[in-house]
């Protein structure tokens, strides 16, 4: 059956040629159904049992779980099927045509991260999955680039508890065992409009927001002073004010002001605790101006994540690669997989190419990635 799989480069080419863009804007958002169908067919050809799950709350998005073997434990290899949108004017190549040039494979999703599935399929064509002593699972998720709805849904509904998981995000084959989380909120202040010639007849939302920002800055300083994780290049939780808008004319009292902000918490900091800290920080403004200040989520929050540094997965991967695990500031689906089993983020390609025009993966990653997948499957599913 394995001989019916296309060659590695043709699998890669087909994945890149199948659009699967995730976007919050409905006009740009695409279903990943065609890509899931491709993957499901190939993993079926390798002897896997394949289950395709609709992801609730999405625009026709699906997860795919391919499994082989029986019993407890085993290994989960995971990745997302979607890409970010692309700026056609900044690409010098067709984003949906795999192009090889100067030892690089160009195309949307080559590094982040549809290409990872080509590596898995290519490595497993030499493995008789029916003879595994422990289960092997391949998970392809939806909407990582926007809501992470696929990973959230899978982690909330599955009964699987593998021994460990590897998410093949582009880390330049540097194993990642921890990263910060991400919380994005909108702070809205509702004032009362009026003519600027008589300020007492209105409530200026910009002035109230100025007061609120002062308290938010105090929270930023408090987070920096109270929480520390030395391994990160920025070893404290960050708080950023990213966007503000209010008012519509210089001679009107501003009736509404809106601030977009984010917090990137360290591993171990709970989302509920952070929401509580933000609400506590803004309480003086809310008490002074009842009913005029609200805080809401802009996007579903992502917690920080950490795999125990002494776990067998860390030890095995560090030995195979001859390098120590690291930590990063960006987010992945790892916090959701970590609720099921210890998880590392580890894959070919550079994060510096993710979300960039003319995205590419260097061909030097092909051989070591194929070898790594073969080795981890052998270690966790044959022993």
Curated annotation (Swiss-Prot):
This is Acetylornithine deacetylase. One of its GO terms (molecular function) is acetylornithine deacetylase activity. CDD domains: M20_ArgE. Keywords: Amino-acid biosynthesis, Arginine biosynthesis, Cobalt, Cytoplasm, Hydrolase, Metal-binding, Zinc. Pathway: Amino-acid biosynthesis; L-arginine biosynthesis; L-ornithine from N(2)-acetyl-L-ornithine (linear): step 1/1. Gene3D superfamilies: 3.30.70.360, Zn peptidases (3.40.630.10). GO terms for cellular component: cytoplasm. The active site is at residues 82, 144. Its EC number is 3.5.1.16. Belongs to the peptidase M20A family. ArgE subfamily. Signal peptide: none annotated. Coiled coil: none annotated. Zn(2+) 2 binds at residues 112, 145, 355. Its main location: cytoplasm. It catalyses: N(2)-acetyl-L-ornithine + H2O = L-ornithine + acetate. NCBIfam families: AcOrn-deacetyl, PRK05111.1. Binds 2 Zn(2+) or Co(2+) ions per subunit. Pfam families: M20_dimer (PF07687), Peptidase_M20 (PF01546). It comes from the Bacteria. Catalyzes the hydrolysis of the amide bond of N(2)-acetylated L-amino acids. Cleaves the acetyl group from N-acetyl-L-ornithine to form L-ornithine, an intermediate in L-arginine biosynthesis pathway, and a branchpoint in the synthesis of polyamines. Homodimer.
């Amino acid at each position: 059956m394995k001989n019916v799989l296309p060659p590695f480069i043709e699998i890669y080419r087909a994945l890149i040629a199948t659009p699967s863009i995730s976007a919050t804007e409905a006009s740009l958002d695409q279903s990943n159904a065609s890509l899931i169908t491709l993957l499901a067919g190939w993993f079926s050809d390798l002897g896997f049992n394949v289950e395709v799950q609709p992801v609730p709350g999405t625009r026709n998005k699906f997860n795919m779980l391919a499994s082989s073997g029986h019993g407890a434990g085993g290994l989960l290899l995971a990745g997302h099927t979607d890409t970010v949108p692309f700026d056609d004017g900044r690409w010098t190549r067709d984003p949906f045509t795999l192009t090889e040039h100067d030892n690089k494979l160009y195309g949307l999703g080559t590094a982040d991260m549809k290409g990872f599935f080509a590596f898995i399929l290519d490595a497993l064509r030499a493995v008789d999955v029916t003879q595994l002593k422990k289960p092997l699972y391949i998970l392809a998720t939806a909407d990582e680039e926007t809501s992470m709805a696929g990973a959230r849904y899978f982690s909330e509904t599955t009964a699987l508890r593998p021994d460990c998981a590897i998410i093949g995000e582009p880390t330049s084959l540097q194993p990642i065992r921890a990263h910060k989380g991400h919380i994005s909120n909108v702070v809205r202040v509702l004032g009362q409009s009026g003519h600027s010639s008589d300020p007492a007849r209105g409530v200026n939302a910009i002035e109230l927001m100025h007061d609120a920002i002062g308290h938010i800055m105090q929270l930023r300083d408090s987070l920096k002073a109270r929480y520390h994780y030395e391994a990160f290049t920025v070893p404290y939780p960050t708080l950023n004010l990213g966007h503000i808008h209010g008012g519509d004319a210089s001679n009107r009292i501003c009736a509404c002001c809106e601030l977009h902000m984010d917090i990137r918490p360290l591993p171990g900091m709970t989302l509920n605790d952070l929401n509580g800290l933000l609400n506590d920080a803004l309480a003086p403004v809310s008490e002074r101006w009842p009913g005029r200040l609200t805080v809401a989520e802009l996007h579903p929050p992502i917690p920080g994540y950490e795999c125990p540094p002494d776990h067998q997965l860390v030890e095995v991967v560090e030995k195979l690669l001859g390098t120590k695990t690291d930590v990063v500031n960006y987010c992945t689906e790892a916090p959701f997989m970590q609720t099921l089993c210890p998880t590392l983020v580890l894959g070919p390609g550079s994060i510096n190419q993710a979300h960039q025009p003319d995205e590419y993966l260097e061909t030097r990653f092909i051989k070591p990635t194929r070898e790594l997948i073969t080795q981890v499957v052998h270690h966790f599913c044959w022993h």
